[in-house]
Design a protein with these regions (language model features):
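Conserved catalytic core of sirtuin-type NAD+-dependent deacylases
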Residues: 1-280
């Protein structure tokens, strides 16, 4: 079965943003780097999930929520002031994420993981689409819409199911549960970011997909990898054009088209191999 959606193929063909020859050359160069890599680290942002129909935080809210901005709802202060409103917004986001399906870019990353010796997947997304596409050991820096944790900090965590539309209470202490995500103004879990940092330092190739490159500290990861000698491949990202150099390889076009193309060109004919196995 082809990884690429024909509808998206037509979108790329009709995009006037760049010379197709330049795009093909960039893809070939990036595929060559990926094929030679032993250790690959991937960072994904909202752009990869947008192609599955999940709005980004830059998109205006719709329906009942149109009167708010995400920045007004995704903060500890908003939860303190009106926990029910914040919970209902996250319940609607969780419902939208459950309906959404992984796209060809998510599936391409699952395939990529089976083709290299060492693979790390770091995401800023909270929709669990990577896991549903078959990716394992995903390092979700911003948490998950599919979980809630105790707002009082007692370490109570529950997986959310469809019936959790009303705000639940912690079974340990009875306090409110909150979405298990990182809100504006909160720090990333230190242990998780340290794992991401180590993956960036150790990799031969760093692939950034659908990221804005403005949300720190994750925005520093591509340049950290580059400073340690990695080739950085940038797919469908506003990072395009931010930095230039022989080790920065930009690929224009939708991630759901360009990422499958990249993986297919890099590993055509190569069998899946055991993680940590020697290079072919």
């Amino acid at each position: 079965m082809a990884l690429i959606d024909p509808t998206l193929e037509r979108r790329v063909a009709s995009t006037p943003a760049s010379d197709p020859r330049t795009r093909a050359e960039a893809l070939t160069t990036a595929a060559r780097a990926l094929r030679a890599a032993e250790n690959v680290c991937v960072l994904t942002g909202a752009g990869i999930s947008a192609e599955s129909g999940i709005p980004t935080f830059r998109d205006a809210l719709t329906g009942h929520w149109a009167q708010f901005s995400p920045a007004e709802l995704a903060t500890p202060e908003a939860f303190t002031a009106n926990p029910e409103r914040v919970w209902q917004w996250y319940a609607s986001r969780c419902g939208a994420a459950r309906v959404a399906q992984p796209n060809a870019a998510h599936r391409a990353l699952t395939l990529l993981a089976s083709r290299v010796s060492h693979f790390s997947l770091v995401t800023q997304n909270v929709d669990d689409l990577h896991e549903r596409a078959g990716s394992r050991d995903v390092l979700a820096l911003h948490g998950s819409l599919m979980r809630a944790r105790c707002s009082a900090g007692c370490d109570g965590v529950v997986a959310l199911s469809d019936e959790f539309t009303a705000m639940p209470r912690c079974v340990r202490c009875g306090d409110r549960l909150r979405p298990d995500v990182v809100w504006f103004g909160e720090q990333l879990p230190a242990a998780d970011f340290e794992l991401a940092r180590k993956a960036a330092v150790a990799c031969d190739v760093f692939v950034s997909v659908g990221t804005s490159n403005v949300v720190e500290p994750a925005a520093s990861l591509p340049w950290l990898a580059a400073s340690h000698g990695a080739t950085v491949i940038v797919v469908n990202s506003s990072m395009l054009g931010q930095r230039k150099g022989p080790s920065i390889l930009p690929i224009e076009g939708p991630a759901a088209v360009m990422l499958p193309r990249l993986v297919e060109e890099a590993f055509a004919g190569r069998r899946a191999r055991q993680r940590g196995a020697a290079s072919e």
